[in-house]
Amino acid sequence: MPCTNPNVFQMNTKKPTMWGSLNYLKKQNLEQTIMDGVKKGNLALLPCGKCEYCRKQIADQWATRIELEAQKWNDVIFVTMTYDEQHVPYGEIVKGNQSIQSQTVSKRDVQLFLKRLRKAYKKPIKYFIAGEYGDRTKRPHYHGIFFGLKPEDGVWYKNQKGNAYFKSEWLTNLWGKGFVDFSPAAPGSYAYVAQYVNKKAIGAEQSAKYWMQGREPEFRIMSKGIGEEYLKEHMNEILETDNITCAGGRQKRPPRYFDKLLDKDTNKDTENYFKAHSDELRAVRAKRRRNAILSLANLEQNTSVPYSTYLEIQKEKDKQKQKWREPKETL
């Protein structure tokens, strides 16, 4: 399924950047614009970043980066941190003369825990942590992947869906606010954590809803450079195939982060995705653009409805799903 609300651009391919000079096109004449762009080879449909497809792509890219990072460490664990009644944080909002309190996630609690953990453990670690609310109780809790962390006092306490879960008094005391369990991490848990960051609507509108309830918005925090070492070591291979082979032979597109790494030395404005100053990145993106136009041409040829109608059908499917393969939370 494609992005259901793409931004349509026309490219001036004579410009020295990969995408050329991008001119935003209005969508009133979408069909004719696409037909003309496919024929001329100067069309770019850039993802909106908000629809179901785009959200899933963002989560998939994070899951891929986490999996690549995990290959560089001997110890990788999946950790869940929850609150006891004594320590669960509350936010407050005043409506009229009434004060309303709601349980809330706390990024500060997680940051202080990480500070204590680094001081106590003393070995290098990396992490990817998502803070969120339970679907049923709305209770705040945290899931994380920790690289390089191995609690020595882990004690088995249950098996669930084929995974062994352990408790650690040392890790629980460092958290200091309730309960902690962990299990050996695997590709399934990488995707599990990555999906949490996108399972609900993202952006200012959703954040405002939380603030109106006196709650902090759901969040994610992570170490810098997740997956960077792997991407740098395999750069030539990735450039040649524009694919990454993950566990089980799964083929993944390189995360957008790879483009930034590839162009980092030649492009000081690394945040500008459309300025590809390195020859390697220009070549990779030119190939992607050609493939995208060919796919669009095939879709136009083999689909009985206009592309704009096709997108509307996909949007309706998106609305009906509401939730896409999201983790089933029991909290």
Explain the meaning of each model-derived region.
Residues 181, 286-331:
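C-terminal non-catalytic accessory extensions
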Residues 135-140, 146-286:
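Conserved His + Asp/Glu catalytic blocks
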